[in-house]
């Protein structure tokens, strides 16, 4: 009798294990079997050591030291969401969190601490509509959403909350990007959305993802209409990735008749792959082009009109090529981009006494007494180029050194005098004859340590 019970138990366990493996085998996973670790803006790890049945943990740390050859006396960086301080070691981003799943329910929470918890929220004007300081409410979250997974085709995910934007190709997490200081196409477009998305995977190689969101990288809404958009990503094979992001909304505060359209399009190609080689082991490039405009409410998109207003648009592009060496332990990246943005509606505004953003202590006035002009008709053109070298001893850590040159058509970057005060300290009074020192060019070196587990 005892032997029979033992045999029954073995049979039951075996049948359960077979059922589980059969269930896993029958589950359709989008992009399954495709190596996407080489892609600019994607996770370079092939697995996670913090993954369990119900939870996949995440720990990230991004620390940097940067030196601008302009050497501003206030150690302040202007025109970047990756960097905040010159000539100092700073922790830019610390994140703890992970993905939860249980019986098709799903959620993700990713925190953010460090300089980015100030640098990124400052660019959102929507918290000044109404009360409750949304920029403080959300500043320590980079992602926070919950939803449900439907087992249709290769999966359908419906999520509500704050999630990452794909516009501009680059990931918000620097450990996923080829370059540290992103070109204007990426740095001047959204990092996050707050709203609802539906991820539809009709085939193994295709994702269609519509959004209904509060607005263009905004915690709240600027007007009545929500932002509408979608991402389409297609990988015909593991060597090629094509994606397009398109957006429509009203993102000029208090101007509901001013409509914004934006189209962001990228192609990534891995054109050499010898992963076991101790010489060149992989080569790939990414190319991104953006086109957008605002029309109505005193501006006229592509063409200046004496009645409808000046042209207001955004045209940009960026290209990067990356070469990996010695079984992908080392990599060299070179690239850059261009941008034109009449009306300056996507320019990252200078900080300090040059800031045109509302004064947090008195929002009826600008933060700076010499605000950077961002009015309809104001012209802005810029270009940049960069090169970096990375050492990646394993998939969890990367050491990177990067050189960046940036140029603008108007004074924009922090010069030697900085943007704070004659002494560089906020405690010093501002003389009547002093003004922020903005210049047209910037050259800098960046050293970064990027950790991910």
Predicted regions and their residues:
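Surface-exposed strand-loop-strand hairpins of Gram-negative outer-membrane beta-barrel proteins
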Residues: 50-54, 66-91, 422-428, 433-437
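Short loop/turn motifs that connect adjacent beta-strands in outer-membrane beta-barrel proteins
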Residues: 43-57, 103-107, 151-156, 205, ...
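Transmembrane beta-barrel strands of outer-membrane/channel proteins
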Residues: 59-67, 109-113, 160-164, 210-214, ...
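N-terminal periplasmic/intermembrane-space "pro-region" immediately following the signal or transit peptide
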Residues: 18-71
């Amino acid at each position: 009798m005892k032997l029979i019970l033992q045999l029954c138990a073995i049979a039951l366990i075996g049948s359960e294990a077979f059922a589980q493996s059969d269930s896993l085998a029958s589950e359709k996973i989008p992009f399954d079997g495709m190596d996407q670790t080489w892609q600019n803006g994607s996770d370079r790890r092939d697995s996670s050591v913090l993954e369990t049945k119900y939870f996949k943990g995440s720990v990230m740390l991004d620390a940097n030291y940067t030196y601008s050859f302009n050497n501003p006396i206030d150690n302040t960086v202007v025109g970047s969401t990756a960097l905040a301080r010159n000539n100092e070691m700073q922790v830019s981003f610390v994140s703890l969190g992970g993905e939860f799943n249980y019986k098709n329910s799903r959620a993700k929470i990713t925190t953010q601490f460090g300089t980015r918890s100030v640098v990124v929220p400052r660019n959102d004007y929507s918290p000044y509509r109404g009360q409750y300081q949304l920029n403080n409410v959300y500043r320590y979250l980079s992602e926070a959403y919950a939803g449900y997974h439907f087992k249709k085709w290769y999966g359908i995910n419906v999520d509500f909350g704050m999630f990452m934007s794909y516009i501009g190709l680059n990931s918000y997490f620097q450990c996923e990007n080829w370059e540290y200081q992103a070109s204007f196409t990426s740095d001047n477009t959204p990092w996050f959305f707050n709203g609802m998305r539906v991820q539809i995977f009709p085939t193994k190689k295709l994702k269609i993802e519509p959004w209904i969101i509060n607005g263009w990288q905004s915690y709240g809404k600027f007007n009545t209409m929500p932002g509408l958009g979608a991402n389409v990503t297609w990988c015909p094979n593991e060597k090629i990735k094509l994606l397009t992001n398109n957006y429509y909304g009203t993102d000029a505060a208090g101007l509901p008749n001013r409509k914004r359209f934006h189209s962001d399009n990228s192609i990534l190609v891995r054109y050499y792959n010898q992963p076991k080689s101790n010489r060149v082991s992989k080569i790939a490039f990414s190319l991104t082009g953006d086109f957008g405009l605002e029309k109505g409410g005193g501006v006229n998109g592509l063409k200046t009109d004496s009645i409808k207003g000046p042209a207001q648009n955004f045209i940009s592009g960026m290209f990067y090529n990356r070469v990996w060496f010695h079984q992908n332990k080392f990599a060299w990246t070179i690239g850059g981009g261009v941008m034109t943005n009449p009306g300056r509606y996507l320019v990252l505004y200078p900080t300090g006494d040059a800031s045109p953003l509302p004064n947090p202590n008195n929002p009826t006035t600008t933060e700076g007494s010499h605000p950077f002009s961002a009015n309809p008709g104001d012209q802005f053109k810029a270009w940049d180029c960069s090169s970096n070298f990375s050492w990646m001893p394993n998939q969890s850590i990367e050491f990177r050194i990067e050189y960046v040159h940036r140029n603008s058509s108007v004074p924009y970057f922090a010069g030697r005098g900085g943007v704070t005060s004659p002494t560089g300290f906020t405690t010093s009074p501002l003389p009547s004859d002093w003004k922020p020192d903005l210049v047209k060019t910037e050259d800098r070196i960046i050293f970064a340590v990027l950790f991910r587990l």
